[in-house]
């Protein structure tokens, strides 16, 4: 959240409004709800996004690009998938379990998905794998796969992980940066819960074992203590 003035602490929550002026051939995405769009008459348009529920500054985002927007829905909540246009035919293959995940997590936690929309956008050259921006998760391009490529890997664990963050990380946020493992551990547990529900305990246990193995192996390549 160093791209705009802010108190950059996870326990400093705020609402936010963002105006994004973009070429008319592009679309934008940010947190919360798209309130309106103004055509500027010069080949640009300005989108007004508003998040009126408090969240941590590091979760504020904006994206602009030549995306296809594939619309979905969970209950009365808009669920949208922003993908490169070549992957529009595969968007619901990639992200189509999202509404079912939202229903499952809402029932499992006894607390409905708390934000006014849920969008997932795919971008290139992102510095990490994915990011759980409030109501607008960002994924690296690796998640875009056609039907044949998805036979090898679906990355559905990433999708469930980032969605579970909408409760643990976004709605409930750790007090300080040193407590970030709390956010991540809950989201990893969300992966397990989804796999157990959707695919059975055997697969969930296997993937949990793989996560545990990778966790221990990190000590070989990082000069930091295991948490």
Predicted regions and their residues:
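Hydrophobic alpha-helical and helix-loop surface patches within well-folded domains
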Residues: 49, 80-227
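Acidic/His-enriched low-complexity segments
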Residues: 1-116
